[in-house]
Amino acid sequence: MAKNAMLCLLILRVVLALAFATNKKGDEEPENHSTGIFGKVGRVVTVALAMSSRLGGADATRGGGAVYGGNLKSNQLPNNNWMAPPPPMAIRSAKVYDSKHSPAEYLKKFAQDFRRKTGMHSQRHHEETTLEQEKRVAGAGPDPIHHQDTTLEQEKRAVPAGPDPKHHEETTLEQEKRAVPAGPDPKHHEDTTLEQEKRGAPAGPDPIHH
């Protein structure tokens, strides 16, 4: 930065010196005084700016290259600190089943372990569980014979004598005898009428006398 500032100051001094020199020459020619001074000053300023820009650009490129090179050097690690990647691990193949057990036994064992871990059961176990639950709800279970016996016992409890037709007929006859003590006996009924007639007529109806 200090070098660039010094160069700029030198360029300005040169420009000013040239401007004053042209000013002195311009006094001899008063007609072209204004135009000559401003034109020359403008040209000198443009040349000075071009030179300063070129010098500044060259210094910047040199400095940038040096900085960039320094960054590269700082980023590069020495070989002593470099660590090699670890060797690849040997991948061991998983054992599908032991040599002592057959594949079918291993699959069965695997299925049992999976059900035990996940809490899943087979359909057969589920059906057995549902049957046990039904038996607990209904102690004897849905037995048709036992159900028929139970209904017959309930009917007997409702009707103690049971629906026996023969016994029912005997019961009706006994009820009739209780209502009529002598019972509806035709022969006995005829004897009763003859006795009543004898009582009505003491001598009785003698056919010969009649």
Swiss-Prot record:
One of its GO terms (cellular component) is host cell cytoplasm. It is found in: Secreted; Host cytoplasm; Host extracellular space; Secreted, Extracellular space, Apoplast. Its main location: secreted. Residues 125-137, 144-200 have a biased composition (Basic and acidic residues). Residues 21-83 are annotated as: Required for secretion from the host cytoplasm to the host apoplasm. Residues 136-210 are annotated as: 4 X approximate repeat CLE. Residues 127-198 are annotated as: 4 X approximate repeat A. Highly expressed exclusively within the dorsal esophageal gland cell during syncytium formation in host plants. Residues 1-21 form the signal peptide. Keywords: Apoplast, Differentiation, Glycoprotein, Host cytoplasm, Repeat, Secreted, Signal. One of its GO terms (molecular function) is receptor serine/threonine kinase binding. Glycans are attached at N32. One of its GO terms (biological process) is cell differentiation. CLE- repeats lie at residues 136-147, 157-168, 178-189, 199-210. It comes from the Eukaryota. Belongs to the CLV3/ESR signal peptide family. Mimics host plant CLE extracellular signal peptides that regulate cell fate. May play a role in the differentiation or division of feeding cells (syncytia) induced in plant roots during infection. This is CLAVATA3/ESR (CLE)-related protein 4A-3.
